[in-house]
Amino acid sequence: MPKIVNQIMKPFLQYYSMNWLKERDYKAKVDGLIRDHLRKVARTGIGRKLGVKPGTSIRDVPLTHYNFYQPFFENPHVGDFIYPIGDYLRVLTSGTMGKPKTFLLPKTGLWNSIQKTGLTFQFLCTHDGQKITYEVGDVVYHNMPGGQFISGFYYDIITRKHVGWITEVPDPNLSFQEKVDYFLKHYKEIDIAYMTVTTLLDQVYPKIQEPLKLKGFLTTDRSAYVLRDKIKEVTGSYPKTIFGSTETMLIALPSVEYPGCFFFDWRVVYAEFLPEKQRLDNGAVTTDPTDDLVPMTGVEVGKIYQLIATPYGNDLVRYAMPDLVECVALEDKVIGSKIPVFRYYARADNLIVLHNFTRINEDELIDVLNTAGVEYVDFTAMREIEYSREYMKMYIELQKPMDAEELYSRVNARLMEYDKDWRDMGDMLQYNPLMIELLPKGTFHRYLQRKTGTPKISRINMSQENLELLKSSTG
């Protein structure tokens, strides 16, 4: 579409794209959307296996996990899905230690999602707290993986459709470092940037050595919430954070009043919330319906929930996401929205996730230590943040003495061999994400003696209370 036409249409589209946020009583529309969606699901193989029939209430549908959909994705048949089978793309998402999971996602659903959220997203990204600064043709820089991952497909769809509202740079097939170099060369021409906080503060800002003048800075890094003031100082705008994934597609939009937070777009997803204490193990196939689920209109500020998502753009129904979110507000006053606002809190499963790039579980860490020749009494590992960098920190008690440098070298070398994502992340972000702290002999024994309740060691993401108890059990 010619730029002049888009410029003429912009005021009308801005009104249309933003006005829905001010609806006060959206519950009736939400209920209608999920009923319509379940009628479509009832006609599919996935729906039949879930027991969904015309008129089935969402409250009666089982909660689902990846293992339920895996047979459909690996051996699809005509009639299994909402859209014709030829409409589906085979998309990869990061699994654990470089072993990706496969999803089938419909091109039509992807495009419908972009049409509903795209302009609202664009206007919110450039909202400076007082006004929207977006102009037709703004240059948007992104440094996210291309190829078979979801971001690459989004880029292909947008460019093929010739939307014309933004100019996207650079080519998504460039390497990570080539994209960084592109930004360093062209940063004065860029209006909106999407990258990790680490890339911004460690690789971009030190080389430019002057504040940027961006209309918007977009990231999925959890550290954006903590470093929001520093990001404002560096980029000229507070960070905008979204929630999206291969499983759900883009289902959330950035809050303006609460930098680093987001709200779920009820036009594209039916979002339910399971209180943290009832969170689910995603190793299951399905989970029976539960009355513990809270609708979006029932969440409470300060409470932490596991997200249960039914995206309208694909075939997942009541999908238990491996993520915990915290409700920080029931509205965003700056944009006049009564939709609850959330921030990303943590993984719901026992995984260590660094920069949403590499994922490591307990069994894999045990294998790494064993194959590295490390004889240990026990260990625990967790994600820690230092400034903009995310690390995996391991606390290890050894059976036999070993020099700390040798231990670090062995474990790090094995991680580099074992996990391509671990190796690539270190190369891209230019730091080593491993930390190790040696614990004195007898630490875990003393810890278990002092610990109340079940005498168990959480090897992944130990609670802060138990970690403090462990640290105080060293002598």
Task: Put a short name on every predicted segment.
Residues 112, 147-152, 202-203, 250:
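Short, well-ordered, mixed-charge alpha-helical segments that flank or form enzyme active sites
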Residues 91-97:
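Conserved helicase ATPase motor motifs in RecA-like P-loop NTPase domains
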Residues 1-44, 157-475:
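Active-site glycine/GP-rich loop and adjacent strand/helix microenvironment
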Residues 97-100, 246:
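Gly/Ser/Thr-rich beta-alpha loop segments that engage phosphate groups in nucleotides
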Residues 28-90, 101-114, 119-133:
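Active-site diphosphate/adenylate-binding microenvironment
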Residues 100, 135-138, 213-214:
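Short coil/turn connectors at secondary-structure junctions
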Residues 99-103, 351-353:
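Short small-residue beta-strand/loop micro-motif enriched in glycine and branched aliphatics
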Residues 119-162, 168-171:
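Conserved AMP-binding loop of ANL adenylate-forming enzymes
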